[in-house]
């Protein structure tokens, strides 16, 4: 059974049923990639811009918030800075990694693009999963 661990640090995420939304996006992404029968694990954080800014500074040396960040698991880390993570091995890679989404940035961007907020968050979750 695929597992999604969701941590919501900002209660505003609950307005779009964040846990169900990101879980569904993850399952559908795996299914479309042909991995529907394999066990995978992922962690998703719903945070605010302040937390995302700290994460972006810590991991990317950028002192600003962003909409989504993703980190492949240690087993799949790139060997050379800037390279893509190692290709997914369905028989070995159970833990894919972590994703974080920033509420204010996602809301601001969805408004800017005249896109439904929940749909935009789902899109960004898929984007994050594909980076793993």
Model regions and ranges:
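An acidic/histidine-cluster motif and surrounding catalytic segment
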Residues: 1-122, 130
């Amino acid at each position: 059974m695929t597992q999604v661990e969701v941590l919501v640090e900002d209660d505003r995420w609950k307005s779009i049923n964040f846990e169900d939304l990101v879980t569904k996006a993850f399952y559908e992404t795996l299914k479309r990639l042909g991995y529907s029968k394999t066990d995978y694990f992922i962690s998703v954080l719903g945070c605010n811009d302040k937390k995302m800014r700290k994460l972006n500074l810590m991991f990317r040396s950028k002192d600003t918030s962003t909409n989504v960040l993703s980190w492949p698991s240690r087993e799949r880390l790139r060997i050379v800075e800037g390279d893509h993570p190692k290709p997914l091995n369905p028989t070995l890679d159970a833990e894919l990694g972590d994703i974080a989404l920033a509420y204010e940035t996602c809301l601001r961007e969805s408004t800017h693009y005249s896109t439904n907020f929940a749909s935009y968050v789902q899109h960004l979750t898929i984007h994050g999963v594909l980076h793993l």
